[in-house]
Design a protein with these regions (language model features):
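Soluble acyl-CoA-dependent acyltransferase catalytic core bearing the H(X)4D motif
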Residues: 1-8, 24-39, 44-230
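Short beta-strand/turn micro-motifs at beta-sheet edges
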Residues: 11-17
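His-Asp-centered acyl/peptidyl-transfer active-site segments
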Residues: 18-23
Length: 230
């Protein structure tokens, strides 16, 4: 298992039905450049190979009522790609307006917390074209902010999409592993009990910083005002 950080867990705590906290990206693909042509099944098979190297896409949340710390990530033993890779068609004429409406609806729907916190939507019918005949295709990826930030999201995107068409898929990467409720609670208790010592360790540095700041303020050597630095 892998324990969430306080920042990552906060994205779970402040999320609400009207304020989903996931990150979305949209790619527009020209399928005429795909060697051998595009089919949805082929895209699915290629994605499955890459997900084996992306443990974030195979991990789900786990917690215990006795847990005094943040939730954890565990491997989803029942992971099913078909629950995350979804397919939809744009209504005619398949323009930017129709695409924006579909993407807005997808983005407004919260992710299912009982599964790995991501979805990928394959949107066909862009500009009234058929992707199987070399038309355009949009792919919208939605990942919870508790699982990725800006840098992590960019790294995941680079694993899903390569600059060269014939690059082999990356080697599989092990996930966070398993954990039962008792293990989650026990490790959470240990972390909770260690917090006073962690606080004691940072207190000297914090006090020294406060004293230094007060001395600088008394001598007029304060920090420059916003937008007022050299």
């Amino acid at each position: 298992m892998e324990r969430l950080s306080g920042l990552d867990a906060s994205f779970l705590y402040i999320e609400s039905p009207t304020q989903p906290l996931h990150v979305c990206s949209i790619l527009e693909l020209d399928t005429s450049t795909v060697p051998g042509g595009y089919t949805f099944d082929r895209l699915r098979d290629e994605l499955a190979l890459r997900i084996a190297a992306i443990p974030e896409f195979r991990a789900k949340l786990a917690d215990s009522q006795l847990n005094l710390d943040y939730p954890v990530w565990v491997e989803d033993d029942a992971f099913d790609l078909d629950r995350h890779l979804l397919r939809i068609g744009l209504p005619s004429p398949g323009g930017r307006r129709e695409l924006a409406e579909i993407c807005g609806h997808i983005a407004s729907t919260p992710l299912d917390r009982s599964r790995p916190l991501w979805e990928m939507w394959v949107i066909e019918g862009v500009a009234d074209t058929d992707p199987r005949a070399g038309g355009l295709l949009a792919v919208m990826t939605k990942v919870h902010h508790a699982a990725v930030d800006g840098v992590t999201g960019a790294n995941l995107l680079s694993q899903l999409c390569t600059a060269e068409p014939d690059v082999p898929p990356p080697e599989p990467v092990e996930g966070p592993g398993k954990a039962g409720p008792l293990q989650i609670a026990a490790s959470g208790l240990v972390r909770f009990a260690s917090r006073p010592w962690q606080l004691a360790n940072v207190m000297p540095t914090t006090v020294a910083t406060i004293v230094k700041t007060v001395r600088r303020a008394r001598t007029g050597l304060t920090m420059a005002a916003p937008f007022g630095g050299p």
